[in-house]
Amino acid sequence: MSERIFIGVAWPYANSQLHLGHVAGAYLPADIFARYHRTRGDEVLMVSGSDMHGTPITIRAEQEGITAAEVAERYHQRFMASWPKLGISWDFYTSTATANHARTAQEMFLSLYEKGYIYKNTVCQPFCSHCNRFLPDRYVEGTCPHCKYEGARGDQCDNCGKPLNAAELLNFRCKNCGNPPEFRETEHFFLKLSAFEEELIRWVETKTHWRTNVLNFTLRYLKEGLKDRAITRDLDWGVPLPLPGYEGKRLYVWFEAVIGYLSASKEWAASKGQPNAWQKYWGGDTKSYYFIGKDNIPFHTIIWPAMLMGKGGLNLPYDVPSNEYLTTESQKFSKSRNNAIWVDDVLSRYGVDTLRYLLSANMPESSDTDFSWREFVRRNNDELVATYGNLAQRVLTMVCRNYDNKVPEYGELDERSLTLIEKTAAMLCETDKALYNCNFREAIRLAMALAQEANRYLDEKAPWKEIKVDKAAAARSLYVAMVALSGLRVAFYPFLPESSGRLSTYLGFGSELEKESWILKMPVVGQELTPPEPLFKKLEDSVVEEETARMGL
């Protein structure tokens, strides 16, 4: 029975390029999940967009001496160019700079305001007398009061993940000039999170299918007690507050950006000429998944659900499969540390499926995982080239050369051959279960294990020897190996769409796997094959030294 799946993916700040940490954290797992569900025949809507209004953008604009709009548009266009290179299959990708998004965000604000979930309050905010302005949260840095991390921001500590406000920081300073700010009174609007605390606890306690790290973090945060949070800032860049007399204030990005999932859905529907089509993905039995990095957990398991509860009539998240951090040399990817590995740069030298494979096999699902170029080369050469790619190349080459580019007659299969076919079918069932539950590392491990088993079968049967004395016996062995390849092209497709499409074409099935089902499709005798090209390329050991030198390590 088909399902309807909504996939919301974290919105990247349009202030820098994409690096591997971004891809492993949210974008690759979301794409894997979307491709998997489409192949199952499910209805899928996967949306995201560029976050154009965050303070990181205004900070960069000031550093470069240009407008925030210019910075945001520059990186939005770079993102748009990067997604196809990565094979990210958005149903719709937009930005927070659209009139549709501003309207949707303002409607959400007014709905919550009219219901009493947003209220005005006079608060003390950091004011830099040297810069002569109020400082939004990311313009203030200092030491986290919880974990003592010295690089915490005025909105959140990246080290321990706890949301903060600037007044909580120790040794705080203005990010722009380095001077300590003073605190002055200003009026802001607050989201009444405290009103949703008990309802959120009851709701989260039902989410036993969530990843343990996500569930525990959320419950711990909830049981510490929710504080109301300001949702406006003294800025001139962002979505204007939809109330008269507050022209100098904007909706703050953590409130505004999550509304992008809804505004993107509406924009997608309008682009299809069906303006109400978004509604089926936000109601009924649709399951909503949000793919994010761990620094965004509270915004998607507490704040966004509270906003949806207050608004009413919209589905709450079914799952928030947040990943931990991908690190290098045990440090989080960071431009300031000079250890970021930029996506466009990597893809200018290596195949997209090679990158997707390593990031999938090493995905930080429950704990931080470390990226290394040595592992990149080893896995490419040992697993993609020598195991999976070699299996496809030698089987299809032998069949094309010796059986006129067609699937041969294979006769009666022996027990060993039937066992491999059964294992292939079982692998598809097991990967189906793993992918359904967002266990991506397990799914790709199962697929590669089947490739290893198929190679063992081929080595035992040795069709290159059989063909010299018994062409029919060789045909049986090669046919069974093609059955294994047929299963592998499906299992690997969500992870490795480019090479899976080519393998599917070589096998005579065509390249559009999403038009099939998550089943083992048997090659038909006489089916036309295409002489194969290697699926993957071997990498030289020198790559390790060259790439670490590029990073200055």
From Swiss-Prot:
A motif ('HIGH' region) lies at residues 12-22. It is found in: Cytoplasm. Its EC number is 6.1.1.10. The keyword Membrane does not apply. Keywords: Aminoacyl-tRNA synthetase, ATP-binding, Cytoplasm, Ligase, Metal-binding, Nucleotide-binding, Protein biosynthesis, Zinc. Binds 1 zinc ion per subunit. GO terms for cellular component: cytosol. Its cofactor is Zn(2+). One of its GO terms (molecular function) is ATP binding. Pfam families: Anticodon_3, tRNA-synt_1g. Zn(2+) binds at residues 144, 147, 157, 160. It comes from the Bacteria. One of its GO terms (biological process) is methionyl-tRNA aminoacylation. The keyword ATP-binding applies. A motif ('KMSKS' region) lies at residues 332-336. Gene3D superfamilies: HUPs, Isoleucyl-tRNA Synthetase, Domain 1, Methionyl-tRNA synthetase, Zn-domain. ATP binds at residue 335. It catalyses: tRNA(Met) + L-methionine + ATP = L-methionyl-tRNA(Met) + AMP + diphosphate. InterPro entries: Anticodon_Met, Met-tRNA_ligase_1, Met-tRNA_synth, Methionyl/Leucyl_tRNA_Synth, MetRS_core, MetRS_Zn, Rossmann-like_a/b/a_fold, tRNAsynth_Ia_anticodon-bd. PANTHER family: METHIONINE--TRNA LIGASE (PTHR45765), METHIONINE--TRNA LIGASE, CYTOPLASMIC (PTHR45765:SF1). Monomer. Is required not only for elongation of protein synthesis but also for the initiation of all mRNA translation through initiator tRNA(fMet) aminoacylation. Belongs to the class-I aminoacyl-tRNA synthetase family. MetG type 1 subfamily. This is Methionine--tRNA ligase. It comes from Dehalococcoides mccartyi (strain CBDB1). The lineage of its organism: Bacteria, Bacillati, Chloroflexota, Dehalococcoidia, Dehalococcoidales.
